[in-house]
């Protein structure tokens, strides 16, 4: 596991332009956690050491505390990977775009279809419509807004977000440049969903572990004194 961890960190560092030593360490740590967790489970069920039927029997008979620990450690590995990727490899693009123009980031193409004024219940908004494609996949639509509330005249920026298993896409529209264009901000934040998946796995693993009766701490049971009449009868 240690050799694979070091190799994984080295490959990650060499393949990604923006990688740093800290990011490579984070990915290596997540790989080490995951491999160690799987190796420990394999040892408990004697995988490749006993006949498959015996390993399968041990697999099915693992206590809840064991499954909870495995799930929690696996969740920690996933969360560390998500935290590292989202911190080190976020891609941001800020530019002025006109309707019909396209900007590419991280393999995604953002095409600004239109910008129009819309009326909300208590605000007016400038709404941009982006068509997003990747390769030959069907496009999706992101519609960020810049809102101005009627009474308070307060302005807010409403980002449009699309989540995938590999990361989140963000689109933000800003002020016009006076020449038919609008300031836009486009982001790709990788592996953000892994943070939530990892956190959920850790919480679920803790709950499963605590459900194991062997790990419950309860009040000592009270032993009943023998009935005096019964003692006399036996005597």
Where are the language model's segments positioned?
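Solvent-exposed, non-transmembrane regions of integral membrane proteins
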Residues: 1-235
């Amino acid at each position: 596991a240690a050799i694979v961890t070091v190799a994984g960190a080295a490959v990650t560092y060499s393949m990604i332009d923006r990688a740093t030593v800290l990011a490579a360490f984070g990915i290596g740590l997540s790989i080490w956690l995951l491999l160690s967790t799987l190796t420990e489970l394999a040892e408990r069920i004697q995988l490749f050491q006993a006949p498959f039927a015996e390993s399968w029997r041990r697999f099915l008979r693992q206590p809840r505390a064991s499954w909870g620990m495995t799930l929690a450690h696996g969740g920690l590995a996933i969360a560390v990977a998500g935290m590292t990727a989202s911190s080190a490899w976020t891609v941001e693009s800020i530019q002025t775009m006109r309707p019909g123009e396209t900007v590419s980031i991280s393999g995604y193409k953002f095409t600004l279809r239109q910008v129009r004024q819309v009326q909300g219940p208590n605000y007016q908004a400038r709404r941009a419509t982006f068509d997003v494609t990747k390769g030959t996949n069907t496009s999706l639509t992101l519609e960020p807004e810049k809102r101005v509330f009627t009474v308070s005249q307060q302005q807010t920026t409403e980002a449009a977000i699309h989540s995938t298993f590999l990361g989140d896409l963000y689109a933000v529209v800003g002020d016009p440049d006076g020449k038919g264009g609008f300031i836009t901000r486009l982001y790709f934040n990788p592996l953000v969903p892994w943070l939530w998946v990892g956190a959920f796995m850790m919480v679920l693993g803790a709950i499963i572990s605590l459900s194991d009766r062997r790990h419950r701490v309860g009040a000592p049971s009270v032993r009943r004194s023998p009935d005096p009449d019964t003692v006399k009868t036996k005597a």
